[in-house]
């Protein structure tokens, strides 16, 4: 991990307005933070805290009401930056009649990747996400976990420097969640910068180097997970653990 910032956010505010231009919802309020090169950074907060809005602002899908964003050395409004970004939305909107190979080839074409490189990247990514056995099955036959994995492979087809993951473990069973976390750790090992958002502390605790806690569109805490858990903060962390007897009973 380097101290070089890949993302710089300064006083970012996003206000949604109604048809008449009246203030309806303030999704973000004066958010300021940096994401360092090579780290896995987590945005943690409940639904409606501003996590997905932040993701969309980074991608340039939304425009801020106030504030500035620099991403990979360019403003968020510069679409050329997207060539170096991979994005996994909370719901993977993929063509269900295509198989895994066809899906990755299709998205590779959108990035103008050559046929030879598309084939190589497709094979590498299918192996990376563990879908060799299902590479020629239509996506409509995939489980939720398999769909998330091919969605991650799609996000990596352009070999991005920055990967944005919106609720990557959403809807996954414990085994699927562990597989996704392993893949995120693999991305860190390869030098990728990852920003993921989640409403689950366990998700960010297992993989993130640092986290930002959002609530009501405002930044409440920022730092390493272990430091935030040890120190006294305004934000309270409530965790629960099942005892061995309870686990045995569930089994």
Regions found by a protein language model. Give the residues of each.
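Catalytic Walker B motif of ABC-type/P-loop ATPase nucleotide-binding domains
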Residues: 163-167
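ABC ATPase "signature
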Residues: 222-223
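A short, flexible loop at the N-terminus of ABC-type nucleotide-binding domains that lies
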Residues: 2-9, 15-30
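Conserved ABC ATPase "signature" region
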Residues: 105, 109, 116-134
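Conserved ABC transporter NBD signature motif
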Residues: 67-83
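Conserved catalytic motifs of ABC-family nucleotide-binding domains
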Residues: 159
